[in-house]
């Protein structure tokens, strides 16, 4: 598949956005944060661009604070995953208490009518 012209490039970007949730020719830094750079580099035609961006943006201390959100999110999801496996033996009440905050919020809003 030859990637010539804007149509093919657009198609590639659409496919990549669908697969990895990102725009490869736009923000490669966001892809790097999510750990998708290696996936992009495996594709022909985009590898040089990815490598170029990767070399120029080293881990500078002022950039590091942007990574904290993803780190926390990953930690939270990992904690929730480990908790859900360990709470199988416990009764339902503790499982409810261990629900993630987003789920809890949704449940609260959903069952507000049934509570009264």
UniProtKB/Swiss-Prot annotation:
Residues 73-87 have a biased composition (Low complexity). Residues 64-116 are annotated as: Disordered. Residues 90-105 have a biased composition (Basic and acidic residues). Partially overlaps YLR279W and YLR281C. This is Putative uncharacterized protein YLR280C.
């Amino acid at each position: 598949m030859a990637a010539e012209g804007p149509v093919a490039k657009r198609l590639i970007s659409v496919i990549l956005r669908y697969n990895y949730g990102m725009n490869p020719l736009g923000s490669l830094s966001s892809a790097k944060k999510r750990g998708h750079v290696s996936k992009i580099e495996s594709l022909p035609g985009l590898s040089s661009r990815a490598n170029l961006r990767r070399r120029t943006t080293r881990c500078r201390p002022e950039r590091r604070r942007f990574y904290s959100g993803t780190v926390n999110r990953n930690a939270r999801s990992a904690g929730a995953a480990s908790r859900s496996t360990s709470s199988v033996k416990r009764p339902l009440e503790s499982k409810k208490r261990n629900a993630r905050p987003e789920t809890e919020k949704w449940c609260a809003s959903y069952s507000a009518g049934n509570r009264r």
